[in-house]
Amino acid sequence: MNEILQVHSLSKSFGAIQVANNLSFSVNEGEILGIIGPNGAGKTTLFGMLSGHINPSNGQILFQGEDISGSPTHERARKGIARTYQIPRPFGQMTVFDNLRVAAIFAGGLSGLDATEWIERTLATTGLSRFSDSLAGKLPLLVRKRHELARALAMRPKLLLIDEVSAGLTEQEVTEFIEIVKRIRNMGVTIIWIEHVIRTMVSATDRLMALAEGEVLAIGLPKTVIDLPEVKRVYLGN
């Protein structure tokens, strides 16, 4: 199986505070890799380094065999890396459709009819077709989270970084979100998904990586990882 992403000895410190320490792992094409860890484990910092928003102090990031460690965010987006945010950041006075158009044109490299067709497919995939003409700033929570996912998908990513989309959702809404994510994977998109809800990660991912204090604690099959004593200790204490 081909590896789309390789991370080698990635570290980040802010002054004297080490938030990521010697992270090394790889992601296979077409898989959903889940990431869990308590607050302060370094999950969001890792996403920042992968997407280009945060420069690592040390280490290397290879995307499809190319070293992107020093590449800016917009170049990584053009190469096929997109991410969502815990707090959605749409253009509130623009429609759902127009938000996706911005992503499809400026990051996805599409224009004209090609952009329109891709946006319509993205809306259908994420269950947002009927909200196409709604103002993004007026959407309810569930729809807002789907819209955040749709904006990232509109960029035509090869690798999609999903950051805690299930917070505040009901169990049924989380189940629906998992189905959407799996549909996106079936479109050929590789996914790395950060989430606090362990049950979601076990049911949605192919492999699971546990972080603690900026280090990789374990990586493997989801049920195997969550049953490890060291992972239980991080979440439940001694």
Language model features: what each stretch is:
Residues 2-238:
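Glycine-rich phosphate-binding loops of nucleotide-dependent enzymes
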